[in-house]
Design a protein with these regions (language model features):
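Short acidic, S/G/P-rich loop/turn micro-motifs used as interaction or catalytic elements
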Residues: 13-16, 43-47, 117-121, 141-142, ...
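Short loop/turn segments at strand-loop or loop-helix junctions that form parts
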Residues: 41, 70-75, 138-141, 216-226, ...
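Short, charged, surface-exposed secondary-structure boundary motifs
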Residues: 47-51, 144-150, 230, 292-294, ...
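Catalytic donor nucleotide-activated moiety binding site of glycosyltransferases and closely related
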Residues: 248-287
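A donor-sugar binding/catalytic signature common to diverse glycosyltransferases
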Residues: 291-336
Length: 449
């Protein structure tokens, strides 16, 4: 008798926790009568040397929810998960091969739960299982922004929903709305229980025990923006020092720095020197733990970052005050304009207090858990400017917002050239010379000159 096989593709522990919470909440139906496969993908630049998901505390309990676990890297070896997709004429062969290898009957129905549907490996899976329904889960602030790339209609029409965390209550995701896909919240209590489960699994970690003993009152989050070519290594090093100094000014004397797993050791050394100069205690945690585990174990009074999703999990699920440092600089630097990090940066810049400003952590400014009325229109306007072709229906609202709200306090969310190319308010007149140059370029391109 044919059965339903659900394939859950994950690449991070945070994403796996999101799926586990959705499963626990019954959002994928009952386990009876279906088979669940956890498909693990390591998307690191060099997977062979990177930390494996199975090595992280808490992974085992999450994996126990599934009937079997498959390593995607091994399945497509020697190809890289981020760079490989099947040729159109080979998709049927790949599906037959994977059904055989993974014990899926030829008549069994398959559903896919994937992250980042715009890129591989999610796109590759969607192409191989071309008749399968798709469930997209988003585990961060990017879900509030537009889809990164235009998806084939054959993929978009199969997407049933976008599962996401309620990181900013009241703010609706733009992701995949061009296909009329509805967003569905993963319940807060289910996600928090999974985070507690992961934290409990890390209880025997000696580094975590040592960190908890230091009783840090502020956590500094590193993101390694230099590897994305947004900041230089020196600039990011200085950004971390600014975080530390801001926390010290706010009265914190015991601080914890959680660097990005791939960040160079020099970042930690620079912070250690700054902590020594400031006369405060700094602990560096370089063990592979979720930031949320630190919130569970250490109960800090402040979390500082640039635009990390972990800032908002601190606020939304633990009620910890958060503060930003360097967000405006990164917002100005990221290119192209449609870079999907722009929406997380916009949200953080609009909502989160700046640690380097006086009275940044005043009581009336610290609650970022609920979206103010000003945030939704701003996000939709930025989203339209990022992907105007995907969301033409947003143009009237974007025009109205720019006419009414664009000034010195909001100009940093937009680029003049982008507004000009879309003939939106704030872009200025498109001069005859500009139009002529573009016409000449198009003509030369058409004629092959």
């Amino acid at each position: 008798m044919p059965v339903l096989t659900q394939i859950f593709q994950v690449s991070t522990l945070y994403g796996a926790a999101t799926l586990a919470a959705a499963i626990d909440a019954g959002q994928f139906g009952a386990a009876r009568g279906s088979r669940r496969i956890l498909l693990v993908s390591n998307n690191s630049a060099v997977p062979e040397t990177a930390l494996r998901l199975a090595e992280m505390p808490g992974y085992a309990s999450i994996a126990a929810r599934f009937d079997s676990v498959v390593d995607w890297n091994e399945a497509i070896s020697p190809h890289h998960p981020s760079g490989w997709g099947p040729r159109a004429e080979e998709t049927v062969l790949w599906q037959r091969a994977f059904r055989l290898a993974w014990g899926i009957g030829p008549e069994d129905r398959v559903e896919l739960a994937v992250e980042s549907i715009q890129v591989n490996p999610a796109l590759a899976l969607a192409a191989i299982f071309s008749e399968s329904a798709l469930h997209v889960y988003a585990d961060g602030l990017m879900s509030y922004g537009p889809t990164r790339n235009k998806l084939p209609g054959s993929v978009g029409c199969r997407i049933r929903r976008v599962l996401h965390l309620d990181l900013v209550a009241g703010l609706q995701p733009l992701l995949l709305t061009e296909f009329g896909v509805e967003a569905e919240l993963v319940p807060d209590d289910a996600f928090r229980r999974v985070l507690t489960e992961i934290s409990d699994a890390a209880g025997g970690d000696p580094q975590l025990a040592a960190v908890a003993a230091e009783a840090p009152t502020a956590v500094l989050l590193g993101q390694y923006l230099a590897t994305l070519n947004i900041l230089t290594a020196d600039e990011e090093e200085h950004l971390h020092v600014r975080m530390l100094r801001g926390a010290v000014r706010a009265g914190h004397t015991s601080l914890l720095f959680k660097p990005h797993p791939t960040a160079p050791a020099r970042y930690s050394r620079a912070l250690e020197r700054a902590a020594e100069e400031a006369g405060v205690r700094l602990t560096v945690l370089d063990t592979p733990l979720l930031a949320e585990t630190l919130y569970e174990r250490c109960a800090p009074g402040l979390v500082v970052g640039c635009f990390s999703t972990a800032m908002f999990t601190a606020a939304a699920y633990y009620g910890i005050p958060i503060a930003k440092v360097g967000t405006r600089l990164v917002l100005d630097r990221i290119t192209p304009y449609e870079n999907s990090n722009r929406i997380p940066l916009t949200i953080v810049d609009h909502l989160v207090p700046d640690l380097e400003q006086p009275d940044a952590l005043a009581e009336e400014h610290t609650d970022v858990r609920v979206a103010p009325a000003t945030l939704g229109p701003l996000v939709r306007t930025v989203g339209y400017c990022m992907q105007s072709r995907l969301h033409p229906a947003l143009r009237p609202e974007a025009e109205a917002w720019l006419r009414d709200r664009l000034d010195a306090t909001t100009q940093h969310y937009f680029k003049r050239r982008r507004l000009q190319s879309l003939t939106l308010p704030g872009g200025g007149p498109r001069t005859t010379a500009v139009r002529l140059r573009r016409t000449v370029r198009r003509t030369r391109s058409t004629l092959g000159f």
